[in-house]
């Protein structure tokens, strides 16, 4: 049975982890969300989230976006390549409802899977 947990080792935790992704990323994006990815040697994907107050003013909206993004990653983690992902949000993401946001994330995960050599 496949475990769908979201343990600490599936998260980017330090600034150096984020810098690693920002140096040579593969990009997949929509007008509201961009997911940067870079291959890692860990054998499993990891995710980091950046939801700037500049783009999403209200805390409950930022929390909703992060919660839905983590949940989408958790459900797709076994179909994703061994990459470090950084999710960047842009203006307008707070206007998306939960279903639209989830569908956009699923589309971006599939795009990263197509771009990766080991997926």
From Swiss-Prot:
Enzyme Commission number: 3.1.26.5
GO cellular component: ribonuclease P complex
Pfam families reported in the protein's UniProt record: Ribonuclease_P (PF00825)
GO terms, molecular function: 3'-tRNA processing endoribonuclease activity; ribonuclease P activity; tRNA binding
Alphabetical keyword list: Endonuclease, Hydrolase, Nuclease, RNA-binding, tRNA processing
Keyword tRNA processing: yes
InterPro entries given in the database record: Ribosomal_Su5_D2-typ_SF (IPR020568), Ribsml_uS5_D2-typ_fold_subgr (IPR014721), RNase_P (IPR000100), RNase_P_CS (IPR020539)
Similarity field: Belongs to the RnpA family.
Stated role: RNaseP catalyzes the removal of the 5'-leader sequence from pre-tRNA to produce the mature 5'-terminus. It can also cleave other RNA substrates such as 4.5S RNA. The protein component plays an auxiliary but essential role in vivo by binding to the 5'-leader sequence and broadening the substrate specificity of the ribozyme.
Oligomeric form and interacting partners: Consists of a catalytic RNA component (M1 or rnpB) and a protein subunit.
Name this polypeptide is given: Ribonuclease P protein component
